[in-house]
UniProtKB/Swiss-Prot annotation:
Gene: arcB1
Purpose: Reversibly catalyzes the transfer of the carbamoyl group from carbamoyl phosphate (CP) to the N(epsilon) atom of ornithine (ORN) to produce L-citrulline.
Organism (species): Streptococcus agalactiae serotype V (strain ATCC BAA-611 / 2603 V/R)
Designated name of the protein: Ornithine carbamoyltransferase 1, catabolic
HAMAP family in UniProt: OTCase
Listed pathway(s): Amino-acid degradation; L-arginine degradation via ADI pathway; carbamoyl phosphate from L-arginine: step 2/2
Length: 332
């Protein structure tokens, strides 16, 4: 077993290929044990703080269920549940929580904040999402791909379609470079990833055999893909001008059945971190329809609900992979 005890999980850039593969294998083992009813608790007596500056369904539920399964207690601090960033600095909050808790999860805006929590709390800190990165999501995405495709990670051709600067796109590119995947990013030139991050990933890829390719050409980019992946085009709270600009750029990149056919792979799977705007059955979805006339955004309802979609298996795997991170870094 790899010794990751007391390590924080802030970005996959902090981990080696062997360490990432260990976490993925541990996720498989823990999932199998839960299904078989033979799970052994490694977090008994541990207290975990969950800091959420941004609301969440999957991340919160995954951390709470994983902690409960493993015997830990959690305290949820929602967007209005603490003074961090308002009356108290993140450095001070880190030192307060570090004296009471054995581990801290943070989901919010700034990568700098999660790094500050890790530096000053003295306990493992786990990144549940920042504007720059989403490392726990990637573990679930990769585990799901392996389960569905029955291929080792290095043989998977993983394609992200959409906004190449998105935090999930960033995290996937990092993860793919570490485990040796072929990673295609299909996006408009205006939405290509940060050059510094791309350079880091390309350097890692030289040592792992990974391949990173970026193109605006949809047909070229998706051909032979094993996985097509997308995420929302715009985050809530961004102004109307941004929505209009982003929709104009990304509407050709909506994942449709036609795009799945372009892969020329009958076994291609569709992944999405969720939530997804694939119909108008939500308030946000209906508002988008009213403002922009779109009944679906980043993915068609046909693909989302179709046989290639594995998004709910992927969502469940958030819990198993998050459990692996907590057990590996905090478990007895």
């Amino acid at each position: 077993m790899k010794n990751l005890r007391n390590r924080s999980f802030l970005t996959l850039l902090d981990f080696s290929t062997a360490e990432v593969e260990f976490l993925l294998k541990l996720s498989e083992d823990l999932k199998r044990a839960k299904y078989a009813g033979i799970e052994q608790q490694k977090l008994v007596g541990k207290n975990i703080a969950l800091i959420f500056e941004k609301d969440s369904t999957r991340t919160r539920c995954a951390f709470e269920v994983a902690a409960h399964d493993q015997g830990a207690h959690v305290t949820y601090l929602g967007p209005t549940g603490s003074q961090m960033g308002k009356k108290e600095t993140s450095k001070d909050t880190a030192r307060v929580l570090g004296g009471m808790y054995d581990g801290i999860e943070y989901r919010g805006f700034s990568q700098e904040t999660v790094e500050t929590l890790a530096e000053f709390s003295g306990v493992p800190v786990w990144n549940g999402l920042t504007d720059a990165d989403h490392p726990t999501q990637v573990l679930a995405d990769f585990l799901t791909a392996k389960e569905c495709l029955h291929k080792p990670y290095k043989d998977i051709r993983f394609t992200y379609v959409g906004d190449g600067r998105n935090n999930v796109a960033n995290a996937l590119m990092i993860g793919a470079s570490i485990v040796g995947m072929t990673y295609h990013l299909v996006c408009p030139k205006e939405l290509e990833p940060d050059p510094e991050l791309l350079s880091k990933c390309q350097e890692i890829a030289k040592t792992t055999g990974a391949s990173i390719e970026i193109t605006a050409d949809i047909a070229e980019g998706v051909r032979d893909s094993d996985v097509l992946y997308t995420d929302v085009w715009v985050s809530m709270g961004e102004p109307d001008e941004v929505w209009k600009e982003r929709i104009a750029l990304l509407e050709p990149y909506r994942i449709t059945q036609e795009m799945l056919n372009m892969t020329e792979n009958p076994n291609v799977i569709f992944e999405h971190c969720l939530p997804s705007f694939h119909n108008i059955d939500t308030k946000v979805g209906y508002d988008i329809y009213e403002k922009y006339g779109l009944k679906e955004m980043e993915v068609s309802d046909e693909v989302f609900e179709g046989p290639h979609s594995v998004v709910f298996q992927e969502a469940e795997n958030r819990m198993h992979t998050i459990k692996a991170v907590m057990v590996a870094t905090l478990g007895d």
